[in-house]
Amino acid sequence: MHSLEKVTFEDVAIDFTQEEWDMMDTSKRKLYRDVMLENISHLVSLGYQISKSYIILQLEQGKELWREGRVFLQDQNPDRESALKKKHMISMHPIIRKDASTSMTMENSLILEDPFEYNDSGEDCTHSSTITQCLLTHSGKKPCVSKQCGKSLRNLLSPKPRKQIHTKGKSYQCNLCEKAYTNCFYLRRHKMTHTGERPYACHLCGKAFTQCSHLRRHEKTHTGERPYKCHQCGKAFIQSFNLRRHERTHLGQKCYECDKSGKAFSQSSGFRGNKIIHIGEKPHACLLCGKAFSLSSDLR
């Protein structure tokens, strides 16, 4: 095996322009961060030295990656426009060296289940391959091309994934429970619920998680970090979701309304509890007497 040298984002990068980034919704951007950090974790486990660039630090902190370039890209000077556009591109590519061993297997890599042809050699990247495995033998500068429509697939985070356009449905199905997903990343994450796999472990307490984002969130409980602060009352939270939920208490918003009783709730947990009461489900059973309850609070 070749020696594993220091790798940076700039070595091999497939980029998104500002316009493409703007077209991605919040879930796609979150998926991008999770995928990139997972790929970084894989490379570290294989012995690569990862250079912590500005973009990686931004990823780990969950910050918005695009803050510049909106005005500069309209410059009339073609050379300056090209240089600035390149400067403000966003790296969207796993950090992998061209000379790495092709015999390495990455079970946790993203699996491509649509046939794509790689431009460098014309090899097929079918469902048995992975994005990272394919890129081990190429420079990463040329995108995969869909055989069905001939358009380039920069990666799974394109505003409209080519696979979904061709099939017009949920193309990735679990072979254990038949639950289907529009993205193979979500399918792989779902399969962990069947296997019990928890690849991301906290180095302080040993608690393990299925997603690296959950591990990062957990680590903040050790450090006491609460980066999300309410501007009205000053209360701080570990997760942005909890801050948004808290802000609804100031606004009096109740986003979840029961279609049977008309009762509204500010939190989805209260809405789900109300729904369980309507259908008569009692999922929380006492281990001592067997009596069951609709709400976990009633069991306690």
Curated annotation (Swiss-Prot):
Recorded family membership: Belongs to the krueppel C2H2-type zinc-finger protein family.
Keyword Hydrolase listed: no
GO annotation terms (biological process): regulation of transcription by RNA polymerase II
Positions annotated as zinc finger (C2H2-type): 172-194, 200-222, 228-250, 256-278
PANTHER family named among the record's database cross-references: FINGER PUTATIVE TRANSCRIPTION FACTOR FAMILY-RELATED, ZINC FINGER PROTEIN 977
PROSITE patterns found in the cross-reference section: KRAB, ZINC_FINGER_C2H2_1, ZINC_FINGER_C2H2_2
Keywords: DNA-binding, Metal-binding, Nucleus, Repeat, Transcription, Transcription regulation, Zinc, Zinc-finger
Localization of this protein: Nucleus
Limits of the KRAB domain: 7-78
Function: May be involved in transcriptional regulation.
Protein name: Zinc finger protein 705D
Any Pfam family: KRAB
GO CC, any one term: nucleus
CDD domains: KRAB_A-box
Species of origin: Homo sapiens
Lineage start: Eukaryota, Metazoa, Chordata, Craniata, Vertebrata
MF terms (GO), sorted A to Z: DNA-binding transcription factor activity, RNA polymerase II-specific; RNA polymerase II transcription regulatory region sequence-specific DNA binding; zinc ion binding
InterPro entries linked to this entry: C2H2-ZF_domain (IPR050752), KRAB (IPR001909), KRAB_dom_sf (IPR036051), Znf_C2H2_sf (IPR036236), Znf_C2H2_type (IPR013087)
